[in-house]
Amino acid sequence: MIYLHRIYFIIVLFTLIFHGRLGFSDNNKLHEAEVRALKEIGKKLGKKDWDFNKDPCSGEGTWIVTTYTTKGFESNITCDCSFLPQNSSCHVIRIALKSQNLTGIVPPEFSKLRHLKVLDLSRNSLTGSIPKEWASMRLEDLSFMGNRLSGPFPKVLTRLTMLRNLSLEGNQFSGPIPPDIGQLVHLEKLHLPSNAFTGPLTEKLGLLKNLTDMRISDNNFTGPIPDFISNWTRILKLQMHGCGLDGPIPSSISSLTSLTDLRISDLGGKPSSFPPLKNLESIKTLILRKCKIIGPIPKYIGDLKKLKTLDLSFNLLSGEIPSSFENMKKADFIYLTGNKLTGGVPNYFVERNKNVDVSFNNFTDESSIPSHDCNRVTSNLVESFALGNKSHKGSTCFLQRMPCVHPKRYHLYKLYINCGGGEVKVDKEITYQADDEPKGASMYVLGANKRWALSSTGNFMDNDDDADEYTVQNTSRLSVNASSPSFGLYRTARVSPLSLTYYGICLGNGNYTVNLHFAEIIFTDDNTLYSLGKRLFDIYVQDQLVIKNFNIQEAARGSGKPIIKSFLVNVTDHTLKIGLRWAGKGTTGIPIRGVYGPMISAISVEPNFKPPVYYDTKDIILKVGVPVAAATLLLFIIVGVFWKKRRDKNDIDKELRGLDLQTGTFTLRQIKAATDNFDVTRKIGEGGFGSVYKGELSEGKLIAVKQLSAKSRQGNREFVNEIGMISALQHPNLVKLYGCCVEGNQLILVYEYLENNCLSRALFGKDESSRLKLDWSTRKKIFLGIAKGLTFLHEESRIKIVHRDIKASNVLLDKDLNAKISDFGLAKLNDDGNTHISTRIAGTIGYMAPEYAMRGYLTEKADVYSFGVVALEIVSGKSNTNFRPTEDFVYLLDWAYVLQERGSLLELVDPTLASDYSEEEAMLMLNVALMCTNASPTLRPTMSQVVSLIEGKTAMQELLSDPSFSTVNPKLKALRNHFWQNELSRSLSFSTSGPRTASANSLVDAEEKTGLLD
């Protein structure tokens, strides 16, 4: 029925033409009032090429432009001269002014064109909003796609009840979608991508039952995907890329049986199972990327006969690839990248010529590994197999982390790549290697020197171009001197619609500076349609997210301007990994329809240490002869004697080199110069393993120097752990390790210098002058910063670490009072995430969790307990171990529980704040702190849950209603006090008798035996 009026219109139009009523005689000119309206419109839009010497309805002059060079350009006015009586005037029914660089505000005078039904002003630079005068118009099709309109959703549009197609894509509208949009019941197409709309989707959208095409990608909506989408039973296309909504995808989606194109990506919320899509038999494009989908891939996916593009990448899918996938004969693209799929890779995936990507998975069937190299396989299988330490056949590029099989003498220590372009020599010493492979939909390319590689995933959909380009040439004006050696690096770039990963292969282990070179060379800064585009993507280094929603133009403050992002990276397994991923943000219709994903111009990797030098012994003998050989032998004898005398002093050097650590960034001479030979006036603290000094390098950079005490071998080993593992951890809330110095038995770590010392000094320093006046917002920021740092250590980093000594003095504050966790010298690796027994208790009285201090049970929940104590100190401004309101209380924590039982927790808030704090936030933070100090580790929250609670993403009410989170069993309090006052006062270290193991269940058993769960 919705198309009957169109059919009727066509029949009438044909009849009128047949009877000669559309001829342009003198009596069939455009109505004079509409001519005046067009003149006003043209003046406001700067449309100077309209020739009013010709009648706008004559089809002559500039009123209909049939030849143009710009893609998407259109300049046409369509009239209807069939109105009765026969000699009446013509009227404008359609105006299309597309891609014409029009500027200014939207003219209200369009409302004077009473018969206008179609208005297309897409891809211009119009500003402001929609005039209220438009409320009386009878528009059916309206497009402002790709302009600069702003403000809230124009309510005047909800008055245009005849609208069938509405596009506001690619503008700057903000705020919620008004409920009045439900009045547009005739809408068939609604395009709202690439704006800044917020709030939940109004349920009134469910009234738009005639929708066939709905797009809301690249916005900031909140809440879940609503169930009312099941009302859109006629919908053919539904796109929700990076729109801010949470999962799960509702089961009601199964009723949308007409869908041919479903695209959803980057959902928030909790993981959920695969949505029921079996009824979507007409589906051609199915994209469910990064939607937190867990579990197996349903078998019926392979039976969807019309499916051409399938993208299930970057989810949590597990199990084997269904055998039904062999039936997907018509599929052009299959992306299963970045999941946890196991089993084997089917032969039909490896052998087919279509684009298939199963990289970054956990396949275990060794027999399905191709016998030849990754770049000779049609499909992309990079890092797709998880075989552990098992022997394997074929190339190592198929294995996770690409293990290096070359001896040390062949390791690489510098790397330069000109991404998307040819070889560029910037000086005598540095040449950027060519990276100009044109293909890229699903590929692996090995560099010319076989020491770097790239993996690309994704095809440029919707651009109507069969020959997608994955390397691009500069189209903007470069702000780089053409005579500059680096000019050639920014003339080209490599792009990818979805995922782009670069590898440094067989690098020597150690600390490196990685420079990523960017310049936006597609979008421009002028008023052309190329200035309307927006590119956003995420940057990962060593699989860790380092920049979210990176915008090259914004970072460089313009197009064509170079910007270099530098990262200190510790390579520990000979592989460097740099990942760029599109996260559904940015424009997809400007300047032309398509995806504008990651872009990179060049990569440089340089060591922060002196690489070892290896010589070919045969060549030396041939060139220098026997005399030199004799001298060399004598030298070896002398060195041998010298080594024998000093072998005890070099034990740590040997230990470090045995671990293949190359972190000798600083010399002892540099360190002594920076610290005035460790002058006592430079001393700023005393750590668990030695003193800490403030230093200043020759270039003026401030550093913190930690000089390791040589009192014990245990300390030496901990130092090795710090160098080898902690420098690989980079997070805004962790103290950054710059490098180390290893000379003889001098073991020194060099950290970033933090201006505001530690949290304990800021809160309760010895004298008032050393304390900082921390307002409430700063305390909350510190609270959240510590929580985020621990979340990273426990859950997000590649190597899981339990700190074991979280306390206020191990939290440092930078110049902006951001919290950074320090002192990982006591950290223990927890690779498999299981509970384990520690044979050495390391921690501080008053901060240690009972199960760890008493039994040696160590999990990340020990850090959670310590965090809870520090959290109380942040809110109260009092030290847990030094504050005793009466003799009945040993710790601040005990007093906190008493106040909680009395219902007067807010008495804990630091009195120096007076009333300048949020009572609601204080109650939340205090209750979270007490939850963290629950005597039972199984009842403590994880640190990610703490972050979610404080950020308001998770409600607190249900947890607070559980007595186990809000009260303390007297038996537990007595047990804890007894332990602190007696057992810990004797010793902080003990050995367990014989080998012991523990699991989550045994931990609970232990709690029951000690009365922790009574």
From Swiss-Prot:
It is found in: Membrane. The chain crosses the membrane at residues 620-640. InterPro entries: Kinase-like_dom_sf (IPR011009), Leu-rich_rpt (IPR001611), Leu-rich_rpt_typical-subtyp (IPR003591), LRR_dom_sf (IPR032675), LRR_Rcpt-Like_S/T_Kinase (IPR051824), Malectin_dom (IPR021720), Prot_kinase_dom (IPR000719), Protein_kinase_ATP_BS (IPR017441). Its EC number is 2.7.11.1. The modification Phosphoserine is found at residues 809, 838, 989. GO terms for molecular function: ATP binding; protein serine kinase activity; protein serine/threonine kinase activity. The modification Phosphotyrosine is found at residues 751, 852. It catalyses: L-seryl-[protein] + ATP = O-phospho-L-seryl-[protein] + ADP + H(+); L-threonyl-[protein] + ATP = O-phospho-L-threonyl-[protein] + ADP + H(+). It comes from the Eukaryota. Residues 24-619 are extracellular. The keyword Coiled coil does not apply. It is an enzyme of class 2 (transferase). Residues 989-1002 have a biased composition (Polar residues). Belongs to the protein kinase superfamily. Ser/Thr protein kinase family. This is Probable LRR receptor-like serine/threonine-protein kinase At1g07650. It comes from Arabidopsis thaliana.
